[in-house]
Amino acid sequence: MGMKFFNPVTPSSRGTILISKIGLSKDKPEKSLVFGKKSSGGRNNHGRITTRHRGGGHKKKYRVIDFKRNRSDQGIVEKIEYDPNRSGFLALISYKEDDTKSYILAPQGMKPGDVVTAGDDADILPGNCLLLKHIPVGSFVHNVELKPGNGAAIARAAGCYAQIVGRDGQYVLLRLRSGQIRLILSSCKATIGVVSNLDHKNRKLGKAGRSRWLGIRPAVRGVAMNPVDHPHGGGEGKTSGGRHPVTPWGVATKGKKTRKKNKSSDKYIKKLKG
């Protein structure tokens, strides 16, 4: 797709860099694969804020995505679409055998007319889904399952991938984008390629309003709050907070390790991040 750079003809367009939508379908989403979605606004079932800085935003419809890829017959890519619920793009797949359709995450380079399939005899081509034991070492994959049959859980965001770096008995060694090397059962599925929209990380929204359209609310600095609201709050005049950076709940931030000790999945991690 590429980037879209704006000339500074208005204050809000100065420095704005967005994702170009050239090549994406302008049609409405497939009606049979769409249903309504109510925004939680960052609240849980008690109505309490559990995730700050969320709320508002444009109304969205949820697209049902096939993360399990259980069909072994060939499908043809009808079009590549924008999805407001995630950073990567979607591919609408049409199966001629029974005239059904499904959405999958579009890998980088996929275009209308491409053929995709899943199964042990699938070719090593972007968009094809295979068991990890059938994918060569060194391949880039996305949509990786953590447990066989549960559906994709790893490497689903724009530009994400994992690399197969080795095998260890019934496990495959997978290097994630964070640098972590993890053991995954070789009977788990993965899709070949890198998730589309690689430039998502380079976009600059340019104005507060565009964040609000996306459902992102303002983030207030702790030093600008009152003492009752944040450990960095209060003080006469402008202050630096007076202590090492912490969250509103007093937990150290900026470098503090957040992973729990003795986590049950530790035995599957060969190397930590970095």
Curated annotation (Swiss-Prot):
Any Gene Ontology CC annotation: large ribosomal subunit
Keyword RNA-binding part of the UniProt annotation: yes
Source species, domain of life: Bacteria
UniProt-recorded Gene Ontology molecular function terms: rRNA binding; structural constituent of ribosome; transferase activity
GO biological process: cytoplasmic translation
Its job: One of the primary rRNA binding proteins. Required for association of the 30S and 50S subunits to form the 70S ribosome, for tRNA binding and peptide bond formation. It has been suggested to have peptidyltransferase activity; this is somewhat controversial. Makes several contacts with the 16S rRNA in the 70S ribosome.
Stated name of the protein: Large ribosomal subunit protein uL2
Organism of derivation: Wolbachia pipientis subsp. Culex pipiens (strain wPip)
